[in-house]
């Protein structure tokens, strides 16, 4: 089959607010961001069931997508560990439309992210960094009892050895889970 050219452009409107906080002498920093956006595309995702398979494509027709997101970050220096702790968190709610088997189906996707980190100089010659990245998302189609859920977890640990002023060696380990 052959596609057709789309001469229309995407449109997007967005409003965003940001709030920052810092106490430099206490090594405390924070940030909060809130965003709402609305976009319109000249095509709509299209899904058709054929012989037990779900065929995905696009069809001509405007599709509106509304998205709300909020994110926050916090960091704090801690002298007794000679380092910093960080915490990043985010939430997003996105709503749009798709066409499945010639029926318009509203859908919503919600995503949560949490990312704690630790960076510390255990000794003058040894630096440790640890990061955990956790994400959870749900895709729900209106009028369907089940929703698609996805969980992912990623951990990373790095150790940097610096036995001499101009020599360093780093060991990195990662673990993934989906």
Q: Where are the predicted features?
A:
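Exposed, low-structure sequence patches enriched in small/polar residues
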Residues: 1-178
